[in-house]
């Protein structure tokens, strides 16, 4: 069994918060695949289904973000799962909006929901070696702005990339069930248009890079390169005078 936990805060007032992007991903997976109805258990909303032959349990902890580990730990003990069977989906300030990264293990990175889960995973074999799916929401720019930023709603302008990201995660979730994390990340990147790009989102054709003109030189350097070498006589009175003047020896 694979347990996919989306993190967030319960209640309609938090539904569209940046901090709730994990809930949004879980909801989209639920909508696009065949799952049982949501039910309340393990201090969470849960739904079970089968994806690519693997039984999957969706979990949305209702404990509030900072106590997410209580709910997830309870569900894992009930089903006798290990951290290798767990994928946690949550918001990441240090990734630009629309970026996705998956890794196994690591630290909480200042995320209180992950801190709670890490604490509860210490009692399981394998400890904190569960898979973490980080969904980029961007950073407000200053530490003192973070609290209001993560608990603020996504802007309308975010809907285009947000809908695309949620759909791509849900459509390719079978790769998670098969533990094909790198292929999953590549598929999401393609869906988000993250192919060959320069900073600022400008796509670059590798063939164009190969044909790029050489770097321009300053007009002074060009003049020096084009300057003809002086015609210095090799023999005669002038040559003898220059040898004495420049100290040139035969």
Curated annotation (Swiss-Prot):
Report the locations given in the UniProt record: Cytoplasm
Single annotated GO MF: tRNA binding
Renumbered to this chain, the Basic and acidic residues biased-composition regions fall at 241-250
Q: Where is this region: Disordered?
A: 192-250
Q: Where does the record place the site Discriminates between blocked and unblocked aminoacyl-tRNA? A: 9
* Active-site residues, as the UniProt record annotates them: 19 (proton acceptor)
Name the chain's protein.
Peptidyl-tRNA hydrolase
The taxonomy runs: Bacteria, Pseudomonadati, Pseudomonadota, Alphaproteobacteria, Hyphomicrobiales
Source species, domain of life: Bacteria
State the oligomer form and interacting partners: Monomer.
The alphabetical list of record keywords is: Cytoplasm, Hydrolase, RNA-binding, tRNA-binding
Protein EC: 3.1.1.29
Q: Where is the composition biased (Polar residues)?
A: 219-229
PANTHER family from the xrefs? PEPTIDYL-TRNA HYDROLASE (PTHR17224:SF1)
Q: Which GO terms describe its cellular component?
A: cytoplasm
Q: Which residues form the signal peptide?
A: none
What does the entry give for GO biological process? protein quality control for misfolded or incompletely synthesized proteins; rescue of stalled ribosome
Q: Where is this site: Stabilizes the basic form of H active site to accept a proton?
A: 91
Which residues are tRNA-binding?
14, 64, 66, 112
Entries under CDD domains matching the protein? PTH
- Which Pfam families did the record assign? Pept_tRNA_hydro
Q: Which family does it belong to?
A: Belongs to the PTH family.
What this protein is reported to do is described as: Hydrolyzes ribosome-free peptidyl-tRNAs (with 1 or more amino acids incorporated), which drop off the ribosome during protein synthesis, or as a result of ribosome stalling.
Q: Which reaction is catalysed here?
A: an N-acyl-L-alpha-aminoacyl-tRNA + H2O = an N-acyl-L-amino acid + a tRNA + H(+)
InterPro entries noted in UniProt: Pept_tRNA_hydro, Pept_tRNA_hydro_CS, Pept_tRNA_hydro_sf
